[in-house]
Structure formats: C-alpha cells, structure tokens
C-alpha cells in the first residue's frame, strides 16, 4: 500500500502564514502539517509515501519520500495534482489532501476497508463545523449515503442541513479494479472536455475540477464508493480563522474535543 499526498497549493486564505511557504508546511501544534501526516502514515505501517508539490516546492524536502511537481498548480486543482503522480497509481493507494491532520484510528479505518473505492466521511461533522463557522451551511457540502453504506451524492452546495449525512474530509483509498477504473475515467472525461463543456463540472475547466466533482462522476458511472464513517478525529487547516481557533483550543487544552494529538 502506498500514499499520495496532494500538497501543491499555496493556501491563500492562511494569509501571512503561507506568504513564503506552502500550506502543507504551516506549523500547527509544534509540527508542520506534512510532519503530522508522515508520522501517522509510518505509525500505521505505510512507508511508500509520495508528495505532489507545487507552490514553493523547493521547501518540501523529506528523506526517503517520492516527489512529483504540479507545475501548473496555479491553474489546476486536486484531480490534476493526483494525476501528476499517476505512475504511483499501480496498487492499493491512499490519497490525502495536504491540509488535513488525522488520528491513526481514522487512517486504520480506511486501511481496513476492502472496497475498490473508499472515502472517509465524518458523521459527527456538525459540531466541528459549528466551531469553525457562524453558519455551517456556508461551507458544508452535500453528502448522502444509501442503505448499503455507499455515497450517492457528494460536493454539492446545500440549502438544508438534512442534505448532509456526513462531511468528506479529503482522505480516500483506491484499490483492486478501482485503480484501473479511476485512470480510465480520468482519460475519458479529459478527452470529452476537449471540445465541449467539462463533463465533471460545466462551471469550471477540466483542469480546475474539484475532487468531489470527480468522485460524483465515478458514482454517476455506476461505481460504488464506500463511506468509511468516522466521528471526528481530524482537522482541516483552510483559513487563518481555522488556525486561530485551533491555536486557542490547543492553549486551553480543549483541542481533544475534535482530535487526539497523541494517537
């Protein structure tokens, strides 16, 4: 099993924290985000780690890891970053956003999933979103799960809280026939977008497709995406407000309401 960390972005919403370094290299609770991630991957037995870099790529330097560069990071999104490392999509592969940290038990839940497509979903998202946002609906996106535990809707803007049965966290796994289906679907939709609107999302170019657009496209193709359900145990660092709130919770020793940093 290997892992691909998507860490090409600058993270402009972190303002001065990312003026001279990439988002994944921001220090949180004494370690950079990448250091938190690499540590938990290794604790869970995964040492084959690839990082897709972009903004200030020269600052991301870890011994024993594999690196690919998304040279077009300013005009592309997560899907294109992933396929910069397409040669690593050759066995069971975990894909992880570069702006999250998570407990080992969250990762182990994903590792243990036997599905071709496994997507980590936080079922206890509401408390976390209420801590981060005055109105959780301004940022939260749709996620619906069928009776078999598979995701049937993901990544859409919502009007009502009952349209959200969990939140996608940016951590997933592809394996077995899922790897080949993933690559085939990418090539198919990329070719379709050359002379017509982007089939994943007509509002953006194919290169700017969101990962949730891509996952919804797989669902629409008939692929079964298992929702690996968790209850907290992770953080996303998306804005300076996030950083300030997490730092305050850490100083008050109440960050454990959302994540156990010792696990």
Q: Predicted regions: what is each one?
A:
Residues 1-18:
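N-terminal nucleotide-binding beta1-loop-alpha1 segment
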Residues 9, 99, 239:
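Active-site glycine-centered loops adjacent to acidic/histidine catalytic or metal-binding residues
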Residues 104-185, 189:
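Conserved core of the sugar-phosphate nucleotidyltransferase
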Residues 2-5, 31-95, 205:
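Conserved N-terminal catalytic core of the sugar/cofactor nucleotidyltransferase
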Residues 60-140:
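Conserved beta-loop-beta/alpha segment of the NTase-like Rossmann-fold superfamily
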Residues 1-3, 161-263:
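Conserved alpha/beta core of the MobA/IspD/sugar-nucleotide pyrophosphorylase nucleotidyltransferase superfamily
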Residues 24, 48, 66, 150, ...:
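Conserved beta-strand segments of alpha/beta enzyme cores
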Residues 20-35:
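Short catalytic helix/loop segments, enriched in acidic residues and glycine
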């Amino acid at each position: 099993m290997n892992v691909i960390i998507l860490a090409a972005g600058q993270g402009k919403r972190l303002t001065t924290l990312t003026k001279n370094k990439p988002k994944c290299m921001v220090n949180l609770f004494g370690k950079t985000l990448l250091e938190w991630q690499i540590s938990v991957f290794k604790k869970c037995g995964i040492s084959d780690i690839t990082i897709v870099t972009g903004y200030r790529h020269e600052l991301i330097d870890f011994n024993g890891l594999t690196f690919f560069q998304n040279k077009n990071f300013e005009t592309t999104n997560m899907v294109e970053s992933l396929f910069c490392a397409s040669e690593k999509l050759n066995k069971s592969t975990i894909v992880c956003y570069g702006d999250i940290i998570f407990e080992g038990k969250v990762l182990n839940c994903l590792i243990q999933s036997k599905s071709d497509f496994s997507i980590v979903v936080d079922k206890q998202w509401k408390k976390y979103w209420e801590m981060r946002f005055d109105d959780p609906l301004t940022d939260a996106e749709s996620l619906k799960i069928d009776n078999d535990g598979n995701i049937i809707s993901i990544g859409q803007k919502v009007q009502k809280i009952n349209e959200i049965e969990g939140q996608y966290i940016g951590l997933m796994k592809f394996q077995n026939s899922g790897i080949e289906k993933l690559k085939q679907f990418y090539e198919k939709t990329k070719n379709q977008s050359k002379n017509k609107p982007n089939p994943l999302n007509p509002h953006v170019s194919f290169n700017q497709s969101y990962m949730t657009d891509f996952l919804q496209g797989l669902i629409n193709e008939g692929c079964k995406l298992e929702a690996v359900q968790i209850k907290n145990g992770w953080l996303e660092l998306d804005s300076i407000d996030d950083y300030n709130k997490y730092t305050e919770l850490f100083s008050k020793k109440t960050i454990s309401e959302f994540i156990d940093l010792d696990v």
